[in-house]
UniProtKB/Swiss-Prot annotation:
Organism per entry: Rattus norvegicus (Rat)
Gene it is expressed from: Firrm
Protein origin, superkingdom: Eukaryota
Pfam families: DUF4487
InterPro entries: DUF4487
Single GO biological process annotation from the record: interstrand cross-link repair
Assembly behavior: Interacts (via its N-terminal region) with PLK1; controls PLK1 kinase activity. Interacts (via the KVVXF motif) with PPP1CC; controls PLK1 kinase activity. Interacts with FIGNL1; may regulate homologous recombination.
Keywords: Acetylation, Centromere, Chromosome, Cytoplasm, Cytoskeleton, Kinetochore, Nucleus, Phosphoprotein
PTM summary: Phosphorylation at Ser-101 by PLK1 strengthens FIRRM-PLK1 interaction. Phosphorylation at Ser-796 by PLK1 negatively regulates its interaction with PPP1CC.
PANTHER family from the UniProt entry: CHROMOSOME 1 OPEN READING FRAME 112, FIGNL1-INTERACTING REGULATOR OF RECOMBINATION AND MITOSIS
Function: Regulates PLK1 kinase activity at kinetochores and promotes faithful chromosome segregation in prometaphase by bridging kinase and phosphatase activities. Phosphorylation of FIRRM by PLK1 negatively regulates its interaction with the phosphatase, PPP1CC, thus creating a negative feedback loop for maintaining proper PLK1 kinase activity during mitosis. In complex with FIGL1 may regulate homologous recombination.
GO molecular function, a single term: protein kinase binding
Protein name per its UniProtKB record: FIGNL1-interacting regulator of recombination and mitosis
Location(s) in or outside the cell: Chromosome, Centromere, Kinetochore; Nucleus; Chromosome, Centromere; Midbody
Amino acid sequence: MSQNGAVATNGVMLEELSSWPEEICRRELPSVLPRLLSMYQCSESWIEHIRILKIIVEMFLPHMNHLTLEETLFSQILPKTIQLFDGMICELTSEARELSSQNLEIQITIRNILQTMVQIIGSLTGCVHHVCATQESIILGNIHSLPSFILHIIKSTFVHCKNSESVYSGRLHLVSDLLQTLFKEAYSLQKQLMELLDMVCLGPSEDENSILTMVEVIHSLMDICSVISSMDKAFHANTWKFIIKQSLKHQSVIRSQLKHKEIISSLCEDILFSFHSCLQLAEQTTEPAAQDNADYRLFQKTLKLCRFFANSLLHYTKEFLPFLPDSCRTLHQLYLQIYSKFPPCLYTAKISKVQQEEIAGTFLVVLDPLLSQLLKSQSFVQTVLASKLDLPHELQLPQVLLLVVVVDKLPSQPEDVQTLWCTEDMTRMSILKAIFYNFGQFSGELSLPAHLQGVKGKGQAEVPVTLYQRICVHLCTFVASLHPTLFPELDAALLNAVLSTNMSTSLLAMDVWCFLARYGTAELGAHHVTLVAHLIKSCPGRCVQLTNLSVLLRRLFFFMAPAHQVEFIQKFSPREADNLHLWQYISFQALPADLRKQVTCEVTGVCTAQCRKWLSGSHTLAELDSLNTALSVLLTVCNSAGEALDSRQLTAVTEVVGQLWAFINVEQIISQPHVQQAFSLLLQLLAFFIQTVDLQLISQVVNVLTLVIKLEPPDHVSLAVLDFLSSLGKLYISQTLRDKVLPSLSCIVASLMVNRNWLLEQHTLEAFTQFAEGTKHEEIVSQCLGSEEIKNKVVSFLEKTESVGETEAATADNSGEQKTDTFWEPVAKVTLEEAKGSAFQPCTKRARQELLLEEEYRSAFQTATRALETTEALLKHSRAPAWLLSELGALQERIEKLKCCVLRG
């Protein structure tokens, strides 16, 4: 029979079958179905294919045994159906290039293909509906080819609809109605299929094919999610909801087969996409409180979508955590990306505080329990604390914020989880070390006034806290809860951070260490002081690490119990030469009054003897090191001993300083570092004794300073010169020396005021202000303000105005670019010996030293007085600004109110 004849015969048969009643279809099913299936396989006409498919589904499917559907029907027709559908997609893509409103033939062809595709999807929907209607519980093995083939068609349909703008270009309007119908049919088919799959139960004894089919279904639905995410948000969310539901429902049999990494990655991508959309909408919303605002309603819907995806991730992670080692990097990046868009990060989205709180209360709260789950994952710990994390600059602060959240959670975790986070190995740091390391990487956020949500004490108003304060407080809280077995790791992390060349890191570690000294036992504090003292003694020379250790020693010494201070003095006696340099780092104010007087006397005697030894020696540069140590310790005594330094000791120090000044050589000050140090120390000591120093010596000193400044000495020498100059304001200079000293002072100030080093210029302004406030020689003030440039600088300094304006955004950008390259290597590791039980009671800790209220009053009053004196001095030499009179009137009113308060008591 010819092909045309066969088609005609098939057409007659199909026409006849379409008129059969239900009873005949049921009776003739065994004989007719094989013939229909054969025709379906052999036919080359799309129209005939769809006719056969509709007859099978609508007339014969209802009479088939549901237990044998796979063998008798689905495995026979679905492969051919997929082949036909894919061919139609290819045909559409090819014909669409020729589509136009003038080319009716192509237009009709394309529309016919789209209509045929709609009919195919409708027939498949009928198959799914029949299976759902005839069974209460579905065995996947009886229909295992149906879900996979249907999902292939659904995905192909959605992809074609998504790409329709590019496929049909500017002629989309010619077929948009059919494309919309096609999308709706595919949407309906997927909903029907998900209802079917929801009726599937997989037991432990399920065969491997059924398990693989369910896994394939979940993965296919995940692929569909990536297609429809930008097409229909509600449908996208419902598909994810179904994926999570089925994954959890069948987890006992499919967990080892699922592509967990891809699922987690897709979920995280959808979370971030929704989150960024939410932020963009928040930035566009001008009135977040207006409920009728369309942008605000869309913002709320998107925010709920964020919460939904986060909850989905939470549930999935909870059940499959042991299978997620490969997903930990993705989860880590998710947290960092989200944190980077919130204060105090430089790259925060510009949204209102109300919207920030709304996002935090709706979305971010879900991430908190997710992090709690991840704490137990060794892979997550390894990822977050990796030694070679190499994060971009904008994620450095988010990393620290994440670690701070972790340390807040660790105290409630079992000891093994705490140990996991607090110990380190070859590939990862401990969490404490990681915080300190990353803290030194974001100088921008620390330099800006980034204030976080405040803290409120009992009966007190909320006070905003800085980023530094927040991190420091959380670290201290964690240290207070740390298990004793982890103290060696704490000590090692603190010491490594203190020895860091990054100032912020070092200061943070010192603050935490001081809290530990205050919170821990007196014995622990004494042990730490001894440890730091030994480290200082072992430093080979002056370096950043020595400076950091010396500051730490000075601070820790205040927390020592008196009994332990006595032991320290005995162990590190200043009478021993190798101990003397330690005492330049210890504030004598930390000692009790009696002990302070005793140690002051002893140290002063040792140091003055050392100076006299140098004076009676050969005065070589090689011997200057020991002299500088003695001078440095003497300066510490003078600055901190207070009344413990009696008149006899003051006289001895003054005499030896005067004798040493005679050996100062201007040329050596410029070229020899040891001479520079001695020169600076002598200037500071002279400044301390300025009221008792012989005026002839002061005249000599000023002459030397004039020569030194002309030679442009190192900055630290210039700073010492400024300290000395500021002290001269306290001094009354006799008429005989005034003409020699005062002009030189104005030259020195003028030279330093125009220095290009901004730090030196700032110190010059401060020193000049102190001098002007205290001096009785007012003529020198006008001499120093000789040029208009210097006068403007002084006025700007006093008015606290910025010399160069900069926008807030520019400040943030510049701060963000100032990334500090921190040298971070473990300098030392320290471990404590295991504590042994002891019968004696621990020593009483050092009582906290409160600043007396009267001293606070006096300090505040002196500050106000100095400010008025400075204003008075300026008025004598320059014209008053227009606003000054009104400000003085306001100040007078405030003084009257203060008087009334004092009188009322």
